[in-house]
């Protein structure tokens, strides 16, 4: 089941989210928008299980990475209205 993984331009290129992901959904790609000259990318969102470990690992005040669970997942967890 695929979830939406959104990476914002507040990414500081620290690699914490990449290292936290148990399924290697994320990887770092070149980007000139921060000192690290890299940012997270999510090329394999079809493998995302929605554990949100990447969100938990993100050290920025505004989470630079967010996982939006699919509607099927939110229904099964009783989170939908």
Swiss-Prot record:
Compartments reported by the entry: Plastid, Chloroplast thylakoid membrane
Gene Ontology cellular component annotations, sorted alphabetically: chloroplast thylakoid membrane; photosystem I
InterPro entries, per database record: 4Fe4S_Fe-S-bd, 4Fe4S_Fe_S_CS, PSI_iron-sulfur_center, PSI_PsaC
A Pfam family hit: Fer4_7
Co-factor requirement: [4Fe-4S] cluster
Signal sequence segment: none
Subunit record text: The eukaryotic PSI reaction center is composed of at least 11 subunits.
PROSITE patterns in the cross-refs: 4FE4S_FER_1, 4FE4S_FER_2
Coiled coil: none
Record-linked SUPFAM superfamilies: 4Fe-4S ferredoxins
Keywords assigned by UniProt, alphabetized: 4Fe-4S, Chloroplast, Electron transport, Iron, Iron-sulfur, Membrane, Metal-binding, Oxidoreductase, Photosynthesis, Photosystem I, Plastid, Repeat, Thylakoid, Transport
EC number: 1.97.1.12
Predominant place of localization: plastid
Gene label: psaC
Function: Apoprotein for the two 4Fe-4S centers FA and FB of photosystem I (PSI); essential for photochemical activity. FB is the terminal electron acceptor of PSI, donating electrons to ferredoxin. The C-terminus interacts with PsaA/B/D and helps assemble the protein into the PSI complex. Required for binding of PsaD and PsaE to PSI. PSI is a plastocyanin/cytochrome c6-ferredoxin oxidoreductase, converting photonic excitation into a charge separation, which transfers an electron from the donor P700 chlorophyll pair to the spectroscopically characterized acceptors A0, A1, FX, FA and FB in turn.
Location of the 4Fe-4S ferredoxin-type domain: 2-31, 39-68
Iron-sulfur among keywords: yes
Membrane topology of the entry: Peripheral membrane protein
Official protein name in the record: Photosystem I iron-sulfur center
Single GO molecular function: metal ion binding
Binding-site list for [4Fe-4S] cluster 2: 21, 48, 51, 54
GO biological process, one term: photosynthetic electron transport in photosystem I
